Amino acid sequence: ISNKTPRQSIKNGFAMLTEERRATGIFPYASILFNTVISNLGSYKKGPLLSDKKMASDTDWSISSMHIKTPSQKTLIKNLSGGNQQKVILGRWLLTKPDVLLLDEPTRGIDVGAKYEIYELILQLAREGKAVMMVSSEMPELIGICDRILVMSNGHMAGILERGKDFGGIENEQETIMRLAAQYV
């Protein structure tokens, strides 16, 4: 896989939710509509212009399907809670119709209710056949969601655990995960 630009990555079916949503995920002084459609502008072309109707429709879909709490698509994203900001970003990426989602700390800094909704979305995407790769520093999150956990230690792959196969399953293997994580320290 050789994706040299974000545009090429999107074209090849990849989407990435970054760890630092405020620094690299959102345009804080732009609307929810802008933040929703920015990664998919090519699909809104109507001659030399953009289709306002399609952008509004896709933003409505994102607000509805992601359960984003907002009074309007015109609301500045900086005025939303962290969880709702994260859901706007996820909706943005889903509109690109990715096959592979890279989620870096997808629930960092968001409330419990939004975490649950994001967990449900991740599981739904996996059921639909999407590849979801998640980076998380929260072990219960990994154990609760992942079918497979790759453990890194000091830049080295220390091991892979699979639900129901290795060491009696990852559900009860926090100790094994911690041991692997410390392997190359």
Where do the language-model regions lie?
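Glycine-rich phosphate-binding loops of nucleotide-dependent enzymes
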Residues: I1-V185
